[in-house]
From Swiss-Prot:
Residues the record lists as binding S-adenosyl-L-methionine: 64, 93, 112-117
Protein origin, superkingdom: Bacteria
A GO CC term assigned to this protein in UniProt: cytoplasm
Name recorded for this polypeptide: Ribosomal RNA large subunit methyltransferase H
UniProt keywords, alphabetically: Cytoplasm, Methyltransferase, rRNA processing, S-adenosyl-L-methionine, Transferase
HAMAP family named among the record's database cross-references: 23SrRNA_methyltr_H
Record's subunit section: Homodimer.
Task performed by this protein: Specifically methylates the pseudouridine at position 1915 (m3Psi1915) in 23S rRNA.
Stored Pfam families: SPOUT_MTase (PF02590)
Gene name as annotated: rlmH
Family: Belongs to the RNA methyltransferase RlmH family.
Catalysis performed (reactions): pseudouridine(1915) in 23S rRNA + S-adenosyl-L-methionine = N(3)-methylpseudouridine(1915) in 23S rRNA + S-adenosyl-L-homocysteine + H(+)
GO molecular function, one term: rRNA (pseudouridine-N3-)-methyltransferase activity
PANTHER family reported in the protein's UniProt record: METHYLTRANSFERASE, RIBOSOMAL RNA LARGE SUBUNIT METHYLTRANSFERASE H
Amino acid sequence: MLNISHYKIIAIGKIKKKWIQEGIEMYLKRLPGLEVKEIKDSTQLKEEHTIKEIISKNEFLVTLNENGQSFTSKQLATKLLNSHNQNITFVIGGASGLSSSLNNLASWQLSLSPLTFPHEIARLLLIEQLYRAKAITQGGPYHKE
């Protein structure tokens, strides 16, 4: 079973759309222990500096990137389960994305889809996929084949 308390999301920018915020809150209630840190929009350099101050050296860093590795929901659940409860930090860029140097620091880069999404929707999708991964590893009814 996934231990969500080992996961953190660093997201650049505020959620402005109410319906997205409501969706995020719904999943966060189902994922107690998942930490979400929101960083103010700024230049990529300032955002990178802030992110580097937040993360620690023992964290497994995953950046969301359209060129990252794609997984099915079951593959993602398996990859997370095989991380053996490492502290995993997911980083979602703002409107300008993440700097290449920050992406290069990542242990791996994750693509949620070959499509490009606004950062607000990417945050909702990631949190939903973490909930789905937890349900898959628990054998719960949420994930349908």
